[in-house]
Amino acid sequence: MLSCKLLAKCLLWASLQNQVPADALLAIMEVEGGRAGLEVSNANGTHDLGLMQINTCWLPDLARAWSIPSSQVRRLIRDNDCLNITVAAHILKTKIREAQGDILQGIARYNNAHPHYGRPYLGKVIRAYFKQSRRAFSRLHGVREKRK
């Protein structure tokens, strides 16, 4: 597990490399709730891997692009937070492109290829984004957040 500072550097680097909003990646990270080494089974037989919960459907393309076996890609993505974030940023960039540059639709498609089914996920990411913004504003201005 990376330190917060190193995680932030990875996130910013991945954001810049893939030209996707860092705050969107951060909100997705919060919603996904993953961590290094985590592998979650899905009903359709795929698995979600690591910090950003990268779906194993991406493994064949990544294995081809990196010229290494899918099993090795799986371990790397599952266990390396920085690489996991970088792959997530690449996926988000791909999904935004598929949505003709619409960031919100790209975020919805990050979770589900069908935009309609991605809407609930998009709502979660937007809520996470605003929650993070409130926390940052509160810290910046020395305001205490109300506890619910």
Predicted regions and their residues:
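Catalytic glycan-binding domains that act on GlcNAc-containing polysaccharides
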Residues: M1-K148
